[in-house]
Amino acid sequence: MEIIKENNENDGENINNIPKKKSGSKRQLSFKKKWKASFKKNDFVNSHGINYNKSVGVGGNSGMPQRRNSIVAKPIGLTSYKINHNHNYQSQKLTWKYTSPTNSSLNLKNSDLKYLNNENKNISDNSNFDDGEEDDTDNKKNINNKNNNNNNPLTDIINIEEKIANTTTTTTNTTTINTETKNDIDTTISKLNNFYDNDETNNNIQNETDGNNNNSFSISNNLIIKEKNNNNNKNDNGDSDDDEDCKIIILDKPHIENLNDKNKQILSQPHTLTQPLTPTSNNTHKSTLFKKLELPPAPPSPPQPPVFQNLNNCDNIIQHQLENNCDAKNKSINIYNNEFDFKNNNNNIIENNENFEKNLNLLNNNNNFYHNNNLKKSKDNILKKSNNNINNINNININNNNNNNKKSKSKIKIFKKLLNNNIDRLNKNNMDNVLMKSQIIQINGAEIDDGNNYFNKNDQQHIEDNLMFLNETSQTNNATCEIDNLIDSIKINLSNGYFIAGQKVTGNLEISLNQDIKTSGLNLKWKVFEHVIINHYQSPQSPQKLNKKDKEKEKEKEKENDNDNENNNSESLIRDQSFELIDASSLKSFSNSSNCGSSLRNSQSINLNNYNFNNYKGGTLKKNSKIFNVLKNSSSITNFLKINPLTSSSSDFSLNSSSNYNLNLFNENRLIYKNQEKKTIYESGDSIFQTDDNGGIMNSGLHIIPFSFLLPSHLPSSFSDFTIDKETNEKILSAIIYKLSISFQDILYEEEDNDENNNNNFYNQHDDNEDNENIRNKKEYLKSLYELLKDYKIKKSFTVCEPSIIAAKVNEIPIRMEKKKSFLVNSGQISLKVALKRTIFFANEKIPINIKIENASSRSIDYILISIKKIQNISLSLIKKSKNNNEKQQQQIEKDNDEQQPNITDLTLSPSSSSFLSNSSNTSSSKNNNNNNNNLIFKKCTFKTSQRFNGVDAHCNFSDTILFDTNEIKGFNQTTNGTLIKCHYNIVIQCFVKRAFNVVCRIPILFGALPENNLTSIFNDEYQLNLLNM
């Protein structure tokens, strides 16, 4: 026999947690065997855990007197569970298990245990109990009477306990019992069976046949019942096996529940009874005895409702979801940690590179000390360490690239999408600017004539052309980022930076390729072009009060102008696409007047296509937007705007705006009139490299390709000038630029079979383990690179001077000039003689001037002024209107334009743009040609610098060599003779005489640029900066 140790977990709960009932309340318990038992709160027990005298009402505070010769078993400190019965009660054999105070339990098998006093066999079903309490002495008497009864099996059980405590040998988990104690146990079991049989016959218990009634009860016993399954554990004779498994029913709640179909109420709440053990002199280690209850077999578990089944399924699903979420989070954390480690590695690589560069810079700065052996050794050590670092970095990068190939390919697609989205956004912004113009036109929709509908059609053409220009420029900018994958470096080297017209230009091309490229060769093109831009600013006049006579005169002029506009022939000069506008400062005074429209028709006009809302040097965006909003929101805008019929389809471009329109500008209440012309003087091209010998493939690696071409002798010198006239509010840009460009010839991409011979080509190179999708993506990407290579060009500018400049420098031909002046009133004259050793000079050079003055008159010369004057002649062509010749003119314009793709430094032409040139300080003349063109020659004269010297008295002479310093001149341009631009220089010597005309001598000279390599792109750089200033 084994004693099983069991720990009571709920021994510490308070008995006061039992719900209270009123004093005097009674509760009667009944179950199938007609047992009656009552229990009282705060009941104390002996060392065996049993009180035979007192009784406690379940759920109540008051005690109830118990019937004589009744035995009530009250165990200690365990809660109870309720047991439901839904079948007829039948006598059956039960196995009892009781727990000792030493946390050990005894299993009594092969018997039905029953302890009841012989005097307590007949208990009536309807016995009543009165409230009240009994003394402790009565309890002791009852206990002694029951213990003295030899026929009572309780005494035998107690004796067995003492024997077990004295004779058993305990191990860690089990105890062994002697054979004597086993025999005693068997005898007590037989006695208990006899009592059990007698009890059934004497009490005449009537078993109920209705098995559907449900009786639930709970007894506050520290009782653990093993109940065997009747269906599965019976032998052939009907007896149950003792060694097979049993159901365990634990009764550990200190309250009783009786639930019937009529009233289903829970009479008490779960709690525990904790009672301290009371040791006695006789029995120090006595185990707790349990009252035997004859219980029916446990019913089969009822089927679980579908609701609870679903809840269980939901719980399982939620658990799986939580586990999946935890796994996903762990995976994301691991990925994040890997990315963080990768970033740290990259940062370490960058820091190593920076340290390496710093070390090299330190060594390069100490070139004077490299002769020492110690420094050489240190340099070698540093270089070795740096090489090791570079090798380590390369290994790390290779590993990272191998791990992240798939990610990089996906990123390439993402970057392409982002680029396309940016292009779409730029197009939308440009369309917004166009819509602003269309809103102005729609305001006057009621007054627009048929000629204005022609304006809308032309505007659509301008918009489409400009959007094409924007897309092409964005593609060229993005191409440089992607072409780096094919081309490592490319550079054009010229033998000199300064060439003379009629001389050969020599140089070479250095190009290193990362991959093989299938091309037929390389082409070289060079050209010379002239570009002229004139911007005229005119501040609008504020409105003045007019007399009646002036108003009448203005009305007559308006009528004449209206008649002239109606009678204009088709051969009239093309006008700007413009609308009439007044100053925004006068809007308040004229906004409510009704006749202001007629009085403003002769106001100055502005080019609507050249209207710009972007920032400019002369003004700010806020001012411009305010003026535009006032015009747009004014109720009488039809009185301020008048759309003129448009006859041209050209548009201008500028670099001061992010959009593809040149849209200029309210700048500090100024209107801009712009005219520009661009012309190609000479261009040629030839192939410098061919790949016929190599099967049409240019292999990867470094290639050095020499080239040369001849410059014609009649070409003008390089030139770049930018001037601002404050008096006339004009900005003039003029430039003559030489450029060469090299591009690939006949780029082809053809997919070939993946043979062993062709696998060396870059478009067939791939790993054997690579997926088909990756190979397709790679080929598509290479196709896009090939398309970019077709338009890819590398450009370089160079400087050219006219042969006359070099000839004058070599020959040094002197020049002399003499001027004489006489006076009407005074006798005598003044003679001025000037001599120069040579006529060619360069910037920042002192010019020696030999001057002789003979003053034979009675007048004195106050002072002598020497200055350098620049004379610049600009010719512009105005194309006449002719509907039949529009297509021919456009073809001629396309020929004059650059054949290259649009570049940042190249501006598109405005073939039919008019000009507004002031005649206040400049002279202009027009010449008619047979091609229906009107050439306008504009002469611009500016003084670069001047110096003042002492004068000569009357009847005196002066002879000396004066050194004229040119250091004060910020920049000189070469003397040039182009088709649109001509620039010359004169040295002007003036003798100032009071109350008389001055004696003036003008000597033409030549200015050139120094032949240095640094001047290869100086004119092109100035040209680009001047474009931004325009």
From Swiss-Prot:
Keywords: Coiled coil. Residues 1-27, 119-154, 539-572, 885-931 are annotated as: Disordered. Residues 142-152, 910-931 have a biased composition (Low complexity). It holds the Pfam family Arrestin_C. Residues 128-137 have a biased composition (Acidic residues). GO terms for cellular component: cytoplasm. GO terms for biological process: protein transport. Residues 547-562 have a biased composition (Basic and acidic residues). Residues 320-374, 544-577 form a coiled coil. This is Arrestin domain-containing protein F. It comes from Dictyostelium discoideum (Social amoeba). The lineage of its organism: Eukaryota, Amoebozoa, Evosea, Eumycetozoa, Dictyostelia.
